[in-house]
UniProtKB/Swiss-Prot annotation:
Enzyme class: hydrolase
EC numbers on record: 3.2.1.14
Gene: Cht7
Name of the protein described by the UniProt record: Chitinase 7
Database matches in PROSITE patterns: CHIT_BIND_I_1, CHIT_BIND_I_2
UniProt source species: Oryza sativa subsp. indica (Rice)
Length: 340
């Protein structure tokens, strides 16, 4: 089963790489430094460490070696340390994504990610997910409690499908494509490839191509053009790239998945005519460029992951779960045969 899923994953990565092409336009909106003297003395949300360079995170790069504030936790701490220090809200309860999904629920959703058959075993830790989410304060913190749960379920479902070793408890089995036949380097003046580096699919959302690595790296404060391997060696960085893809709008006319699942996007008449409606299904349209929508299976596997995770979190599914019949935002079907 793992071998078959690996073959399917290679096909899916090609589709995903095409789907995120428009992210080059999002690079211009990359954020400035987040904390410390570079940001007027601001502190990081959710008690993340502020690095010497003014970025928020939980690894030793942030919490040691010139850390400016809230330097008490590093990635060496366990989940209990994260819960006790990083995630404590002013009232004493949990803050951020940890208030939506607990470590126990995370384990129930992804029980086989550390299986001996999974190349990513030991990589995708709950504490890394929580630390990365802290750099995106709106994630799992927009809307009412049910909306927040559905966003976490949707994000974990889409990333589980992208890294799956089988349905529907085998999410996060892979952290990068093995045996890539391309370095995924294309000419780009702003995000030129570093010599000898490969930008194949890595991380929970399987980010690919130099322009996406460059834009994501600038947004999260990491040199991913020079060190793309970080996405497969640092779990916090890996989750941050996935969250950047989730939170970033592709173009003025195409929303981010975050905006869709939190009810911040309203379809235009053109969207309605194209069959695009609010709901989990539209996130599949966005993330695959419509490959699984018009002529595909509507993202049935992705829906199954999503339903399972909503059940774990105890929340309803919401409307429009699949994307069958939706046109992609660019107005054309790229290759329905590439969908899986």
């Amino acid at each position: 089963m793992i071998a078959a899923r690996a073959a399917n994953l290679q096909v899916a990565m090609k589709a995903l790489a095409l789907a995120v092409l428009a992210l080059a336009y999002a690079a211009a909106t990359a954020r400035a430094e987040q904390c410390g003297r570079q940001a007027g003395g601001a502190r990081c949300p959710n008690r993340l460490c502020c690095s010497r360079w003014g970025w928020c995170g939980l690894t030793d790069d942030y919490c040691k070696g010139g850390c400016q504030s809230q330097c008490r936790v590093s990635r060496d701490g366990g989940d209990d340390d994260v819960a006790a220090v990083l995630l404590t809200a002013p009232g004493g309860g949990r803050a951020g994504v940890a208030s939506v999904v607990t470590s126990d629920q995370f384990e129930r959703m992804l029980p086989h990610r550390d299986d001996a058959a999974c190349p990513a075993r030991g990589f995708y830790a709950y504490r890394a997910f929580v630390a990365a989410a802290g750099a995106f304060p709106a994630f799992a913190a927009t809307g009412d409690a049910d909306t927040r749960k559905r966003e976490v379920a949707a994000f974990l479902a889409q990333t589980s499908h992208a890294t799956s070793g089988g349905p529907y408890s085998w999410g996060y089995c892979y952290k990068e494509v093995k045996g890539a036949t391309s370095d995924f380097c294309v000419p780009n003046a702003r995000w030129p490839c570093a010599p000898g580096k490969a930008y194949h699919a890595r991380g929970p959302m399987q980010i690919a191509y130099n322009y996406n690595y460059g834009a994501a790296g600038e947004a999260i404060g990491a040199d991913l053009l020079g060190n793309p391997e970080l996405v497969a060696t640092d779990p916090t960085v890996a989750f941050k790239t996935a969250l950047w893809l989730w939170m970033t709008a592709r173009s003025p006319s195409q929303p981010s998945p975050h905006a869709v699942v939190t009810g911040q996007w309203t379809p235009t008449p053109a969207d309605s005519a194209a069959g695009r409606a609010p709901g989990y299904g539209l996130t599949t349209n966005i993330l695959t460029g419509g490959l699984q929508c018009a002529g595909g299976n509507g993202g049935a596997d992705r829906v199954a992951f999503y339903k399972r995770y909503c059940d774990v979190l105890g929340v309803g599914y919401g409307p429009n779960l699949d994307c069958f019949g939706q046109a992609p935002f660019d107005g054309g079907i790229m290759s329905a045969s590439a969908a899986k």
